[in-house]
From Swiss-Prot:
GO terms for biological process: cell fate specification; cell-cell signaling; proteolysis; regulation of gene expression; smoothened signaling pathway. Transmembrane segments: none annotated. This is Indian hedgehog protein. Pfam families: HH_signal (PF01085). It comes from the Eukaryota. Keywords: Autocatalytic cleavage, Calcium, Cell membrane, Developmental protein, Hydrolase, Lipoprotein, Membrane, Metal-binding, Palmitate, Protease, Secreted, Zinc. Intercellular signal essential for a variety of patterning events during development. The keyword Cell membrane applies.
């Protein structure tokens, strides 16, 4: 992310869910999922952000 978008940081919007905001099978209830975005909330970056996460092993 730092190399692709200098000065843009990641935002973690949720990691653990105990309020039932996700689907019944969601890994958020086990603490094995995370919702992230970029600090500028630019939706045009989301596809690449997902690709970077997969390449990093997430």
């Amino acid at each position: 992310v730092m190399n692709l978008w200098p000065g843009i940081r990641l935002r973690v919007t949720e990691g653990w869910d105990e309020d039932g905001h996700h689907s019944e099978e969601s890994l958020h209830y086990e603490g094995r999922a995370v919702d992230i975005t970029t600090e500028d909330r630019d939706r045009n970056k989301y596809a690449m952000l997902a690709r970077l996460a997969v390449e990093a092993g997430f």
